[in-house]
Every structure is written in C-alpha cells, then in structure tokens.
Regions:
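Sec-dependent bacterial lipoprotein signal peptides
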Residues: 1-20
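Short acidic, glycine/proline-rich loop/turn micro-motifs
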Residues: 60-63, 105-108, 157-159
C-alpha cells in the first residue's frame, strides 16, 4: 500500500508543529549584580561620588534591553559595594565607558533561514572607570582600569538562555574590572586606603 505525498503532508506538518511546542525549562538569571562577597575597600575619604562621563556615544537601547544588568548599572553597583568612605576628602568614581556592541550573525540561507532558529551574535562589553581621590590637604591620586570581554552566542537560544549568557558575560567583565581596579587602588592610592 502506497501513501501519496499529498495525503501525508498535513500529518507531517502537524508532527513538526507539535515538536516545536516542546516545553522549555526556564533559565534563572539574577536581576541584580552584587560585589559584596569581597570586603569593601576602605578609603580615607568622607564620601565617594559616582558619576558617568557623557561621551556622546550612541546607545542601542534594543541591545541593552537584552541585559538583565546593563554594564553601567553593574559599574555603579561595583562602586557602591566595593568603595567605602571613612575619613576626610572626596573620592570620585567616574564611569568612562560602559558599552555593548552586538554583531548579528546573518540568518541561514534558504528555507532554514525562514523557519529555523534565530541567528546568534557576538557581544562585546567594554567597561572603563577612574577613581580619583581629592585629599583635604590638596593631595590628589588617581587610578583607572579598562576591560573588554566578548562572547559569541549560538543561534536558537531562548530569550532566558540569551539573558543568562549575557549576564555571565557582564559578570566576567566586571570580575576582571574589579581585579584590575583593586590592584590599581592598592598600588596608586595606597596612602588613602585604610
């Protein structure tokens, strides 16, 4: 007994559609990024100001919306968690760069590109910050750090999986920034560290 292709096509379509509706396990992504697992860096300053330098660079809000914690928020939280005031003078932490670049991969060619998974992309996060100390007696000190990290995400990720992967990329970038900045503080701002 032979089955004609035309008769089997609707059944095949239903089977394929049912396979597409398989349940997807949610991926947990924290809604904030904290740096309080390490002790704060106690500075001999009365307060620590946090500001962001306006570089005039274009911000792609569509790309930033993919991040549970955008890089500029992560940098502000780093300064709040890691820099502790306790003396005289002023500390000023300036966010010089907190950018994300997205390079989209082209969709697959042919029918796969029309119905296949969404294409992936390469994401590059660059963060740069500067800490200045303005002492009561007019002394000044400064250190800075700049870190860039990139990751290519494969196509077909769920929105939750992509958000988690970008969170992990942000965390890796900020972990490297934290290490560089702490080294710089201890090396160049040691007179103001308790």
């Amino acid at each position: 007994m032979t089955i004609r292709w035309q008769a089997a096509a609707p059944a095949l379509v239903l089977v394929l559609l049912a396979a597409c509706d398989a349940p997807v396990e949610p991926v947990e992504t924290p809604s904030e990024m904290r740096f309080s697992e390490k002790p704060p860096i106690a500075l001999n300053v009365a307060r620590v100001e946090i500001e962001k330098m306006d570089t005039g660079e274009r911000v792609d809000h569509e790309v930033l919306a993919k991040f549970a914690v955008p890089p500029d928020e992560a940098m502000r939280q780093w300064a709040r968690d890691r820099l502790q005031a306790g003396g005289g003078g002023t500390g000023r932490f300036t966010i010089l760069t907190a950018s994300v670049e997205e390079e989209k991969q082209p969709p697959a060619k042919g029918a796969v590109g029309w119905v296949g998974p969404a294409p992936g992309g390469r994401y590059t996060i660059t963060v740069e910050g500067r800490l200045e100390i303005l002492g009561e007696g007019g002394q000044r000190g400064m250190t800075a750090a700049k870190v860039a990290r990139a990751k290519t995400l494969e196509g077909g990720l769920t929105a939750d999986e992509r958000t988690r992967a970008l969170y992990d990329l942000t965390l890796a970038t900020m972990t490297a920034f934290d290490e560089q900045m702490e080294r710089g503080i201890r090396r160049h701002l040691n007179p103001w560290v308790f």
